[in-house]
């Protein structure tokens, strides 16, 4: 089982943690259990991407996009087809997740064509909109922007950066309090 942290994404970078996704192998495929908060209500595309990076990156047109360094949907067979989780298109196509009106998501999806060994170290992305599992009328199911993501690993590099930043802030505050008391 992997417990991975998910973070808010923008074209400026990787931001605060918004929850976790738990991944585990089952006889029916890879089970992904999302516990997220702070997302817009509604359906959201949910995909494994080809690289293990969620920093901003350039798309094919050269525009910097949120989570662009994750690359495209995982598609090792190079099908080039967006057919959803149950057909033979992108392997990274997952069932969409549903966010409640209060911005929380407590949803579980099953990816029958995947196992942990297929995805460990890669990026998991939540898209702004739902997914119709087609490239019509919009590419990649119409999911639009990448709004959240994480690296499929128990060892979150972004959590370490956040923890180190918080420790630096705490140390600075503590030093300031000590200096103030000395006055």
Residue positions per predicted region:
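N-terminal leader/targeting pre-sequences
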Residues: 1-183
């Amino acid at each position: 089982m992997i417990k991975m942290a998910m973070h808010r994404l923008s074209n400026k970078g990787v931001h605060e943690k918004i929850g976790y996704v738990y991944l585990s192998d089952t006889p029916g495929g890879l089970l992904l259990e999302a516990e997220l908060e702070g997302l817009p209500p509604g359906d959201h595309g949910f995909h494994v991407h080809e690289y293990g990076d969620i920093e901003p990156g350039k798309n094919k047109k050269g525009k910097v996009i949120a989570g662009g360094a994750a690359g495209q949907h995982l598609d090792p067979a190079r099908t080039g087809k967006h057919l959803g989780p149950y057909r033979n298109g992108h392997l990274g196509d997952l069932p969409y997740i549903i966010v409640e009106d209060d911005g929380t998501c407590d949803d579980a999806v099953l990816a029958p064509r995947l196992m942990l060994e297929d995805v460990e170290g890669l990026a998991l992305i939540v898209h702004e909109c739902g997914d119709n599992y087609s490239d019509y009328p919009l590419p990649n199911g119409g999911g639009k922007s990448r709004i959240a993501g994480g690296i499929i690993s128990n060892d979150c590099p972004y959590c370490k950066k956040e923890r180190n930043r918080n420790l630096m802030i705490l140390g600075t505050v503590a030093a300031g309090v000590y200096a103030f008391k000395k006055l």
